[in-house]
Amino acid sequence: MSEVKKIATRESYGNALVELGKKYENLVVLDADLAGATKTGIFQKAYPERHIDCGIAESNMMGIAAGLSTTGKVPFASTFAMFAAGRAFEQVRNSIAYPKINVKIGATHGGISVGEDGAKIGRASCRERV
C-alpha cells in the first residue's frame, strides 16, 4: 500500500492550477500580493505570462478578473477568504455574480487564524464566521 503524502489544501490548489494551465491556454491566475501564501506562486513559476499580481487591491483584482473573462480568458482570482468575501464583496456581486461572468474565486485561509501567514491580531482571519 502506498503512503499518501499530506500537503496543505492551498498547495494542492497551486498544483491544480498548474495542471489546469496545461489543459487550458486561456486560464489566467490573479492574486492580491499573496502568491506565497495562497500558493498561486506555483502557477506563476510555471506560467509567468499568465499570472497577474494585482497588489493589495482585492476589489480591483475582481474587476480585472471580470474584464479578462469578457475577452475569453478564464480567470482564477485568489486571495484570503476574508478579503474575497469582505473587501471585494461589491465587485464580486456587481461585476461577476449579477452578469454571470465566468470568474473562479479561490479563497484560502478561511478559518479563525491564518497561522504563519498573517498578523497575530486577526485582521486577515474570518472570525465573523464563528
Language-model regions, residue ranges each:
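Thiamine diphosphate
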Residues: 1-127
